[in-house]
A protein has these predicted regions:
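Catalytic Zn2+-binding segment of zinc metalloproteases
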Residues: 80-96
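Alpha-helix termini
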Residues: 39, 43, 91-94, 98
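Conserved catalytic/binding loops enriched for acidic/polar residues
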Residues: 93-199
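Metzincin-family zinc-dependent endopeptidase catalytic domain
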Residues: 1-83, 111-112, 122-125
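Residue-level preference for alpha-helix termini and adjacent loops
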Residues: 20, 34, 89, 100, ...
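Poly-acidic low-complexity segments
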Residues: 22, 36-38, 89, 192-199
Length: 199
């Protein structure tokens, strides 16, 4: 009945953002962010495994509060995406070429993926010697709401005023056609069917 952010006392290493939709209209009528107590352990493990090869800060037993705060903000933003109806977009993780993910200029502008709804949370491609490359959300501006996310919210929420139902459908289709050849706007569901959905 009420949208909430909840801390759940549980051994689970997870967070999620479920929502309830009106089956007649698709309107989201209630949503939550569930933050399980041990999700910080999961964040620590991800950050260590994905960045420790090039990031001395990730090798410590405990992280600075500022680092953990950035990790929490990033995952909270991902879960918020679910509360407004965005599904996982695992196709986003293959949008950027490896050389771009090793570029400081590129990663500080675009992050690690064009969608926060992917699990490409940290720059696990960076190698020793990739000076200045962005490794985590605060390196490129947190949260990393990507170009795909902005596009998906526009497609799902932008009012199309003074249009008939058929005209509205055509406008929505035209927005899809405009981006269909751009990998930054590619969608890939989670489920392991498409090898380009890498996370």
């Amino acid at each position: 009945r009420y949208s909430t952010v909840r801390n759940l006392a549980s051994p689970s290493l997870n967070a999620n953002g479920p929502h309830v939709s009106d089956p007649r209209s698709g309107e989201i009528i209630e949503s939550d962010i569930n933050w399980y107590h041990n999700v910080m352990k999961l964040l620590r493990n991800w950050y260590f495994v994905q960045t420790a090869a090039v990031n001395p800060e990730a090798r410590g037993v405990e992280f600075k509060n500022e680092v953990m705060g950035e990790l929490i903000r990033f995952v909270s933003s991902h879960e918020f995406g679910h509360t407004i109806g965005l599904p996982h977009n695992m196709g986003s993780s293959s949008a950027y070429p490896v050389d771009s993910l090793r570029s400081a200029t590129f990663t500080k502008k675009y992050g690690t993926a064009p969608s926060i709804m992917d699990y490409a949370r940290f720059n696990y491609v960076a190698q020793p010697g990739d000076d200045g490359v962005a490794l985590m959300p605060s390196d490129w501006g947190t949260p990393n709401v990507g170009v795909y996310d902005i596009y998906a919210v526009k497609w799902g929420y932008k009012p199309i005023l003074d249009a008939s139902e058929d005209e509205e459908k055509e406008i929505l289709r035209s927005w899809i056609r405009e981006k269909e050849d751009d990998l930054m706007f590619r969608f890939g569901p989670s489920g392991g069917i498409d090898p380009s959905s890498q996370t």
